[in-house]
A protein has these predicted regions:
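Structural and coupling elements of P-loop NTPases
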Residues: 1-523
Length: 523
């Protein structure tokens, strides 16, 4: 029973550059899972209904995702857990952490723009973890690059072998559909349908194909399919599972075209939950005892209640409601009477969850990102880094009557990992560090709308925040004295050096040879 439940789980993230169509694809997958009746248009000028996975007010207003949302549904005999991640580069850290909680990834690429910066960075994280990748080339109903040029670009930019499993017949206004190489079926395109398009079984070597798409396109398709067989490696599931080969699908998420082929193939070939590396040992999903780690914390999923939810990935065994589990960092036992599973902000209480599932645990400040829960074993799961921010600003209270609300808001948003908080040792002022400007706007907006607190920003020109440590306590003290005005503490009380230029950092590294300067911290 346990092994069957684990084997039917598929936990994956959808990642891409901003505007490639991740959230549209998520919506259509939910449509097939029967979770929503009509998919919301993501662009803000077409608001029939906002996207299901964009649940914060700011996401609905701007038509972008600013936080990872978790959704689960059943499809055929499989239990699917989707994590829709922000594509905007300012929220990359949320996405990096999400990749530690999934077993495979679907990368969405815009057919007209090809591989973009953010996609490249996220693929590096997938490569580091040998995560299996499927690529969906989206927006084929608009003018797109030549599909062979796209395949070359994917191989070169993402450093992975590719094999198309569906193939487009033209693009833009001439787009006729895709040929499903995997199932040897022709799928004809009908725009703006919320339902599945018609599939026709055709032998591509007969006139049947010509009757459906016309002789010129049929001839072109036959020669392209021959070229594919000659140039690209045979699709091999083992190579895909090792992260060495990426199957490629073409379609249009907004028009719900090519999505079902992607989903059907995905559930068949994608891995069930994989082993997870802890500092002490490798944890196998089939182990009878429950283990899990917190990879994300979200405040105010329900704005009527100032509640936080810790997202926990079940790594092994079975989680049961109201059972005592050990919170390893605090070394204390906790019970959870209302663990939840999600459909964006709609949540339902669950009695049990298996390896591969993502559950939400109510959090009143107990959890931090990276915390481990077990049945008693002292385990620490690895690989939840926090990167040195790129931008820094002082945060000031704009309404002295709301100091308490502001402090609570900052604490909860920092728990989420939205940004990082440092306290300057020289003047005691709070500094917020982020990856991009948009995060400052999101923090200000959420403080005002969710905590009724106002803040203002004061610019601060810094180059990097470096976590420092040394085996020589005397040298560490000497460094902290000399650089006193540049020293800060992070939320865990660790020493951070705020270098205001690359030159200052270089000189510090030369003058203090026994001090280690780190650009990432483990949470």
């Amino acid at each position: 029973m346990a092994n069957q439940e684990i084997a039917r789980r598929r936990t994956f993230a959808i990642i891409a550059h901003q505007d490639a169509g991740k959230t549209s694809l998520t919506e259509k997958l939910l449509l097939f899972g029967g979770q929503i009746q009509v998919a919301g248009a993501v662009k803000s000028n077409k608001i029939k209904k906002t996207a299901t996975s964009d649940w914060m007010d700011i996401e609905k207003q701007r038509g972008i995702s600013v936080t990872t949302s978790v959704m689960e549904f059943d499809y055929h005999d499989y239990k699917i857990n989707i994590l829709d991640t922000p594509g905007h580069q300012d929220f990359a850290e949320d996405t990096y952490r999400t990749l530690t909680a999934v077993d495979s990834v679907i990368i969405v690429v815009d057919g007209a723009k090809g591989v973009e910066t953010q996609t490249r960075k996220l693929m590096e994280v997938c490569r580091m973890r040998n995560t299996p990748v499927i690529i969906f080339v989206n927006k084929m109903d608009r003018e797109a690059k030549d599909p062979f040029d796209l395949l070359d670009e994917l191989e070169e930019e993402l450093v992975i072998n590719v094999r198309p499993l569906t193939w487009p017949i033209e693009s833009g206004p001439r787009f006729k559909g895709v040929y499903n190489i995997y199932e040897q079926k022709l799928n004809l395109f009908q725009p703006s349908k919320q339902v599945v398009t018609e599939k026709v079984e055709v032998d591509i070597h007969t006139e049947d194909l010509d009757n459906h798409i016309g002789t010129p396109l049929a001839e072109k398709l036959r020669s392209e399919l021959e070229l594919i067989d000659g140039v690209y490696p045979e699709f091999n599931v083992d190579d895909y599972l090792k992260g060495e080969l990426a199957p490629v699908f073409f379609g249009s998420a907004l028009n719900n075209f090519g999505v079902q082929e992607l989903l059907d193939c995905f559930v068949e070939i994608a891995p069930s939950p994989r082993p997870v590396q802890a500092e002490e040992r490798e944890v196998q999903p089939e182990e009878p005892k429950f283990t899990g780690f917190v990879f994300k914390i979200t405040a105010n999923i329900d704005p009527n209640h100032r509640s936080c939810v810790a997202f926990c990935k079940v790594c092994s065994g079975k989680f049961t409601r109201n059972t005592p589990y050990l919170h390893v960092r605090h070394n204390k036992t906790m019970r959870f009477s209302s663990p939840t599973q999600f459909m964006a902000q709609r949540k339902t209480t669950v009695d049990e969850a298996w390896a591969g599932d993502i559950i939400g645990l109510p959090d009143n400040g107990t959890f931090k990102i990276g915390d481990t829960l077990t049945e008693g074993e002292l385990l620490h799961f690895k690989g939840l880094p926090s990167f040195s921010p790129e931008m820094f600003k002082y945060i000031e209270n704009a309404d002295p009557m709301k100091t308490k609300q502001l402090n609570k808001g900052i604490d909860q948003l920092m728990d989420e990992g939205v940004a990082q908080l440092f306290v300057n040792q020289f003047n005691g002022r709070k500094i917020i560090g982020t990856v991009g400007q948009l995060q400052f706007e999101v923090i200000q907006y959420r403080l005002e709308n969710e905590y009724n607190a106002k803040c203002r920003w004061e610019p601060l020109s810094l180059y990097k925040a470096c976590w420092i440590e040394s085996d020589d306590p005397a040298e560490l003290e000497a460094f902290k004295k000399r650089k006193y005005q540049y020293m800060a503490k992070d939320r865990d009380g660790r020493d951070v050096f705020l270098a205001d230029s690359g030159y200052v950092l270089q000189m510090a590294q030369m003058d203090f040879k026994h001090i280690k300067f780190h650009f990432t911290s483990e949470f």
